[in-house]
């Protein structure tokens, strides 16, 4: 029975990854600016951010030391020996690796690095091997530009063309950085990712009652079944991501279950799993919990498994790293056997030598020579002298139309551009520049296509071939008319991007611009664009104000129009009162036995005063203790909330010591207002939210008292308050 596991992997939050990237970039930038990694100014205050900045700063320091060592090796023939300074060891290592590459080039040896070089050493070795050669269509070796030339590699393409197996990070430096997903470690070459064996590297990832089984990218904690099956669920894990065993009745979270009474004394041996009252075989091959290498095939057995060596057919070759079998194509004169190309002995299988000749087998071919000739290949006996003399094969026309060069015991044909001489087959063969000089023939933004005697470079979409036939130049779609952007076009390497003017957003087709309705977006957000009304326009918006208001220079604020200042009320018997959004003309109307204080003795703003005048015979008038009636007119906006009291009116009584004044609010309603007293001043305040349009009238009784508390005078203040429809 096969046991399947559901693997659940939790991804690290993108915001946290972006935070670490920002912190790392800060450390890199610190080294570039200061050339040190002390007193790093981190992008964040957390210990995690500071640690990331320190790591990336030291990485930049070591990369700089390696590059410095490479530069020294290009100019000098010896490397610095001071390895006790920070980065000194890596500087000398990269210098030695570059000198090794130069030695191989000087001896015309293949520039191939051995296994075991560090990532920095390998980069220096390859730079000194490949950075100074460039192959043209004619296969001539000339001096060219290195691969990190900004004209060859566009920054935007570097991750797309990198050899990172998992993740690539382009931080804008000289090179990109590779990293691996959770459960993998970066290989020494700095690009490949290898599985991390958590069962060996982590400290007790599983409990004592569980076996740790390594898997690709994670591990599994596999429970051992003891006498008592009940077991609190423990999640199987890949890295830190929990997963649950399917069809396992004892793997459900928070459950306890017991085996039947008939099986409570039953225990399963290693390689078996207790399930549904029985011990069932664990298929280690299907679970991937076996340790067979890539050169072996896992075969499940009852309670265990075995590893059988993989075998390939006679015409196949086994990859020593992956174990895969690939077909072998042998050249003429060879046949495949046991994964190798073996020479065909034409002298046995058949040849065309004459009667006076004998057949001599050669690698991949054969030759006919005079019988009894004891000379080596390429030589023949001189009948007169009895000595072996070189055979001038060029006189036999062996090279055809090509130039022939006779050599002791052999010959060589001088091949044309794009060809090379195969000494075993004695013929000129086409050079596949795309394979032999991979990465150095065409731009990284191009595909290399081999042709007979040459090669061609085919650029990727968005690029065009330069005049040298090898480099790819970016096509500016914005200026050539390829781009169909409605408003603005921005060229990027290999493509383009449409952008819109302010007030527009890019549509779904990526070319057309759609108007943004700013009024709808901001409506009801508490941060409206306009104080009054908002009207959307193409690419913008327009603010309007209600009647009685005017727009301010900022284009969004509304202020009240003071109609009274414009002389709207005419006549001395009227008082013009400006309200929010309007105005009122109040006729001066005093009660009986009161006359208008035309001299405005009490200096009432937005109102008037009426003074009592009685004849000596009018006892009723004389009995009225109210000496003065004040009329005030005020305006307030509609307010949904009030954080602190708002002053509406201020009444001043000009009475000094030893007299005192009391202010009392005579007001019936929802109690939106109150009056507070500061010495001889009464202040009317709005204390509760109020909505308009409406008019509120309140009365304030003013009593003047003597030092002994006797009321000496009565006065009244009648305040009419206009509440606006708007909150401004």
UniProtKB/Swiss-Prot annotation:
Protein name (record): Fibulin-1
Domain of life: Eukaryota
Glycan attachment positions: 624
SUPFAM superfamilies: EGF/Laminin (SSF57196), Growth factor receptor domain (SSF57184)
Additional note from the record: Although involved in the same pathway as gon-1 and mig-17, it is probably not cleaved by these metalloproteases.
PROSITE patterns in the record: ANAPHYLATOXIN_1, ASX_HYDROXYL, EGF_2, EGF_3, EGF_CA
Tissue spec: Expressed in head muscle cells, anterior and posterior intestinal cells. Isoform a: Expressed in male and hermaphrodite gonad, anterior and posterior intestine and pharyngeal basement membranes, body-wall muscle, GLR cells, uterine attachment and mechanosensory neurons. Isoform c: Expressed on ALM/PLM mechanosensory neuron attachments, in flexible tracks connecting the pharyngeal, body-wall-muscle basement membranes and in uterine attachments.
Gene Ontology biological process: extracellular matrix organization; positive regulation of locomotion; protein localization
Taxonomic lineage: Eukaryota, Metazoa, Ecdysozoa, Nematoda, Chromadorea
InterPro entries in the cross-refs: Anaphylatoxin/fibulin (IPR000020), cEGF (IPR026823), EGF-like_Ca-bd_dom (IPR001881), EGF-like_dom (IPR000742), EGF-type_Asp/Asn_hydroxyl_site (IPR000152), EGF_Ca-bd_CS (IPR018097), Fibulin-1 (IPR017048), Growth_fac_rcpt_cys_sf (IPR009030)
Observed effect of gene inactivation: Gonads have short and swollen arms. Pharyngeal defects. Movement is lethargic.
Effect of residue 290 to Y: In k206; No defect in DTC migration. In a let-2 (k196) mutant background, partially prevents anterior DTC migration
Domain EGF-like: 155-194, 195-280, 281-344, 343-389, 390-429, 430-473, 474-514, 515-559, 560-610
Assembly and interaction partners: Homomultimerizes and interacts with various extracellular matrix components.
Pfam families reported in the protein's UniProt record: cEGF, EGF_CA
PANTHER family given in the database record: FIBRILLIN-1 (PTHR24050:SF27), PA14 DOMAIN-CONTAINING PROTEIN (PTHR24050)
GO cellular component: basement membrane; extracellular region
Keyword Nuclease: no
Functional description taken from the UniProt entry: Incorporated into fibronectin-containing matrix fibers. Plays a role in cell adhesion and migration along protein fibers within the extracellular matrix (ECM). Important for certain developmental processes and contributes to the supramolecular organization of ECM architecture, in particular to those of basement membranes.
Signal peptide stretch: 1-17
Every Anaphylatoxin-like domain range: 23-64, 65-96, 97-129
Family: Belongs to the fibulin family.
Transmembrane segments: none
Annotated keywords: Basement membrane, Calcium, Developmental protein, Disulfide bond, EGF-like domain, Extracellular matrix, Glycoprotein, Repeat, Secreted, Signal
Disulfide bond entries: 23-49, 24-56, 37-57, 66-94, 79-95, 97-121, 98-128, 111-129, 159-168, 164-178, 180-279, 285-298, 292-307, 347-359, 353-368, 375-388, 394-404, 399-413, 415-428, 434-448, 442-457, 459-472, 478-489, 485-498, 500-513, 519-534, 530-543, 545-558, 564-576, 569-585
GO molecular-function terms, A-Z: calcium ion binding; extracellular matrix structural constituent; peptidase activator activity
